[in-house]
């Protein structure tokens, strides 16, 4: 996970608490520096130094987008800082009348409040009401890394598929909103020289090229109307099919025309058929309904109590697959793992 300030700026809770912590620490440091050192508790200097280290650690974890992996460690570290700041406050308020000492005590009071908030948040369960309320402010603004290393499909390219499917019912939309690992790289391009013919002789349409491949006709298969086929390998990573059935044409390819007389089936595929290379090892139940962010093509929508297959369950966003075969990412605090 690379270092990026967008990971930090995308979380309002991180910006608010760390900014508040830096301001409070500066107040405490200024008071300690202005105090008479002969009467100032020397151990309080260690508490002030320890506090800034904790603030910097939390900032780095947020910037690297792996804060979730160290929450329990942070609870212990912040608890120690909480003891230091509260003890320093007690010593400076009741044992000195120096304005510098009182200024340092004021900063330590603010740091104690901050440390208590961090303990409650980092120590709380992701499904707790307080954590879900706090995370709700960053759920839409937090940037996601695209799944895998494929180039993201632009919004205009997806709309081109939608328009083509709306104008010809023989052409189905085979675009997944998520970037699937191991999918061929390269953006989708329109303007293929191959046509998909309809069985009734209607005007053919030119579908977009699949990334890294071309539509072709299997050898030895010739018909009068020059029907074209798409190999099943070209459909790798495109699980997000429409709800309508897809005609099957055997192991060598899938017939995308209306000429096939073979049996139809629902568009739910196994791991080997989809070619994603992902094994969804867990099942999760949706605690709430979630509408995917229209600006992020990787997200999927789901409804409350829906059962999802999930994997890669580290962090705030998990890879998930719905019952209809749609693959993408879902927020971890909206679902609950089921015992299998």
Curated annotation (Swiss-Prot):
Its main location: membrane. GO terms for biological process: filamentous growth; regulation of actin filament polymerization. It is found in: Cell membrane. InterPro entries: SH3-like_dom_sf, SH3_domain, Sho1_SH3. The chain crosses the membrane at residues 13-33, 43-63, 66-86, 102-122. Belongs to the SHO1 family. This is High osmolarity signaling protein SHO1. It comes from Candida tropicalis (strain ATCC MYA-3404 / T1).
